[in-house]
Amino acid sequence: MAECSGLQFVSPYAFEAMQKVDVVRLAALSDPELRLLLPCLVRMALCAPADQSQSWAQDKKLILRLLSGVEAVNSIVALLSVDFHALEQDASKEQQLRHKLGGGSGESILVSQLQHGLTLEFEHSDSPRRLRLVLSELLAIMNKVSESNGEFFLKSSELFESPVYLEEAADVLCILQAELPSLLPIVDVAEALLHVKNGAWFLCLLVANVPDSFNEVCRGLIKNGERQDEESVGGRRRTEALRHLCKMNPSQALRVRGMVVEECHLPGLGVALTLDHTKNESSDDGVSDLVCFVSGLLLGTNAKVRTWFGTFIRNGQQRKRDNISSVLWQMRRQLLLELMGILPTVRSTHIVEEADVDTEPNVSVYSGLKEEHVVKASALLRLYCALMGIAGLKPTDEEAEQLLQLMTSRPPATPAGVRFVSLSFCMLLAFSTLVSTPEQEQLMVMWLSWMIKEEAYFESISGVSASFGEMLLLVAMYFHSNQLSAIIDLVCSTLGMKIVIKPSSLSRMKTIFTQEIFTEQVVTAHAVRVPVTGSLSANITGFLPIHCIYQLLRSRSFTKHKVSIKDWIYRQLCETTTPLHPQLLPLIDVYINSILTPASKSNPEATNQPVTEQEILNVFQGLTGGENTRPAQRYSITTQLLVLYYVLSYEEALLANTKILAAMQRKPKSYSSALMDQIPIKYLIRQAQGLQQELGGLHSALLRLLATNYPHLCIVEDWICEEQITGTDALLRRMLLTTIAKNHSPKQLQEAFSMLPGNHTQLMQILEHLTLLSAGELIPYAEVLTSNMNCLLNAGVPRRILQTVNKLWMVLNTVMPRRLWVMTVNALQPSVKIVRQQKYTQNDLMIDPLIVLRCDQRVHRSPPLMDITLHMLNGYLLASKAYLNAHLKETAEQDIRPSQNNAMGPETPEVTREELKNALLAAQDSAAVQILLEICLPTEEEKAQSSSTYSLLKSVQSTTSPKSSDVEEEEDSLLCNLREVQCLICCLLHQMYIADPNIVKLVHFQGYPCELLALTVAGIPSMHICLDFIPELIAQPELEKQIFAIQLLSFLCIQYALPKSLSVARLAINVMGTLLTVLTQSKRYAFFMPTLPCLVSFCQAFPPLYEDIMSLLIQIGQVCASDVATQTRDFDPIITRLQQLKERPNEVSGLCKDSPYKSCSRDITSVDPDVQLCQCVESTIIEIINMSVSGV
């Protein structure tokens, strides 16, 4: 708005005085300044104040005295004397009339019969008419604005353009707005004033006379403004008006700028206000407000703001660049001045060339960047990156030259200096077009050479672990491996912004790096000499040596140039702490891959060396003693977990690549089992579980490796037990820990065990105290506990001691399971073996898990110790599977050698070995099950002691009669132990059956004593799966298997009365009927005598089978009777009774206890087998009838 250039605006001093009603400051104003504020001051002096205080009364007197000498006050007083109510009514009528006429000019109610022009009319009019003239003109403009639909127009108005009457028109405008606020909202008036000449001046006067409306007016103008103000006349006028307002009230300029960003309107205004603010602020060495503001817009998180401002930059570049009046040009000029203001003074290429000859290498003739300018220089670089990369700014030649001068300057060795060099380097990569001449390219190469030479010095002086040297090395490696996308990601990450970089733009930089500065051999040799990062953790950000080593390992540079990297990696693993750095696990994985697989087939020996066993053991020294020795440990838990991850991953990868390595005739060394036995794997996993948040994905990776290679350490029961041991209850109990409990030594525990036959109290007391210790603190007592377990098998040891030992063993099992199992198995050997000193190793037990069951027979009747034995058996069965799988993979070369001359192809040997392994595992599992089932049988001694013990196996649901004598109490105890052991075994068998249903089928096809069927069916919930294969078992040719199948089915039908059971029972009845017709006399007796009682169970479970079963029984009786009839006719009465039983069961049911039926089973052994079978049939029918009649 150049038309306002000759007018006097309200000064910031005067506006502040009006805001604060500072009468003293107002009195100090000059007459021209005071003239602009008269409307408000006169109203203030004449209107009744709300403030009735004495101080305001004094101030009001000063204001009246101030106004008394001003001539224009009289005209303003006359304006205030008008009837504004009538004026408002007339204005409302005119508005309604204009609305009816469609906005046409028409006849005005406010002003009628204008004799002359508006200016002359205003001059000759009195105060009321002047008010009407201005109001009519203002309402007309406001109506036109509301009808314009956002299109800007400039309204010609004599009243607002005549320089003679501007002040009087402004007085009238201010009075009208103050007296008629509902008719003339100040925001609408402000919007209308933008459309007239001198509108900005009128707007400033209006706001100055209503200072409280400043923020409201500014927000309204911004909200109604254009998204891009530089593109239109209206936008530029709006920006200029708001800029004048902010000059009048500079304290609110930044708040107005915030409104601009919030609304995403008028970007030029935001920049202009920032430029005004930058000129006013003191010129210090810090980052300017302009740099901060523009950086915040382009690098902030609000994508809408970023797009809006980027559009402003792009549109501004499309206009003429020499348009000095544009805000964008002013911004670029200011930024360039700031950039040039911090540049070093001496910057000449030829000086450097002379320096290379005449000066020492450590002396630089460059004027380095001043330390106080480094942060500002970094901020400017990032801003220019954002302007060029995000907003699309195309730098001028001057800007490009100055930017390159700044980027290749040399900062001091401080953390900020390291950051500046990193930013400069990434900016060179991102915007290689800044280097356009050979001289500039030479300057860049020299600067890069200086970076290489100085990076170690910078790192040592600045104390920053992430130096720019690692970034240089990393970029060089990426260029050598042609990973241009990785370089782009690196640049964007360092600059902190996502910008588009074309890979083709990096071609020249790639040539410079790979041929002039960093050859691959130089990169590799330099990388291995880079010191490891001390206390490496995720808290250390930036690009570190580990990133460089990782990339070199991936590209196989170390093996290609025969550089050993093993020691560097080992040192770095030893220098780690929590939180875990995310690059460590990928580094270990790629290192393992470089050990096992050569870089090329032509050179199979080109691999890295693995970490030695002694180096691995060094990391875990002092750990086997438990938690009480942790302070003496040399290495952190992070290092130990990483080395454990390395060992487990190495072994897994070695097994996975066995075939490939065998084909290449390579066999890398595997770590010995002795080494693995010395690593406390479970203890370390427990430690990792408590540090999951700090270890990132390491804990889950270790669990995966453990489940694959050490399934016996991932038993579900162990995890559940561990939750109980480490839970709240255990923590509360540990709070009861006394000094006495802590003072018990393993030696005292041994002495207490030695006193066992006579004194139980001391041992019980020590064991109870030990239960309060944590798992790690119990480790020193493990050997004493296990070595004395054999003593606990003697008679008279209290059950409480056994249970406490079991509890302590389970706690120790959470931290040292493998060593604990070996010690326990050796301790529970029979006495004869202990004398021979036959000690089993971990390897022995994995090869033959059944060793666990070759323990002292007394263990089989000690439930707490049997629980431990079963736990170990389950673990070693799982370990044996993993061991055999690993062994199969380790010996894969045996598959390859024969297959080379085998016409059958390479698959045949592998399938055979796999089948052999599966057969061995099946035999092993089934043998374990058969031994456990045998343990469930009562011994001859137990049978002799109590007949009720044996009857328990017949019926699980039967209850024992109460005993009264003291001798029977001992039998009851024996029965209780046997029952408890049976329950423990059934629980384990259930788990094994669920884990592998094939075991169930194999065991039942092998068969076991029928006395155990009642126990297994009732005690093992998964026995119902036997229904799937019973038809196949019945179809076997062996008579014993058929009998066993029918007996098993009878118990299953009672336990699981399902439709499937019914169908299988029908099949069994049909098979029995078929066999009746084909079996010889001896086989018929052998088959039907044990299976006939099963028919009672079928009938009990499924009453619909009654008719079929009765028919079968009659058929059996008839067949047997026919054989007897050939010898004698005395058998007819039995056949007659059988027919009566079938035809009239209700009549006979009451007589079942009479002598004819009661004597049917007597003297069975003294008669012919057919007679015995007939009597058994009769007994079975009677039992079925009794059952059906009684409703059982």
UniProtKB/Swiss-Prot annotation:
Membrane topology: Single-pass membrane protein
Protein name as catalogued: Integrator complex subunit 2
Top-level taxon: Eukaryota
Transmembrane segments: 420-436
Family indicated by similarity: Belongs to the Integrator subunit 2 family.
UniProt keyword Membrane present: yes
Keywords recorded for this protein, A-Z: Cytoplasm, Membrane, Nucleus, Transmembrane, Transmembrane helix
Protein purpose: Component of the integrator complex, a multiprotein complex that terminates RNA polymerase II (Pol II) transcription in the promoter-proximal region of genes.
Gene Ontology cellular-component terms listed: cytoplasm; INTAC complex; integrator complex; nuclear membrane
Secretion signal span: none
GO process terms (BP): RNA polymerase II transcription initiation surveillance; snRNA 3'-end processing
Organism name: Gallus gallus (Chicken)
Quaternary organization: Component of the Integrator complex, composed of core subunits INTS1, INTS2, INTS3, INTS4, INTS5, INTS6, INTS7, INTS8, INTS9/RC74, INTS10, INTS11/CPSF3L, INTS12, INTS13, INTS14 and INTS15. The core complex associates with protein phosphatase 2A subunits PPP2CA and PPP2R1A, to form the Integrator-PP2A (INTAC) complex.
PANTHER family linked to this entry: INTEGRATOR COMPLEX SUBUNIT 2
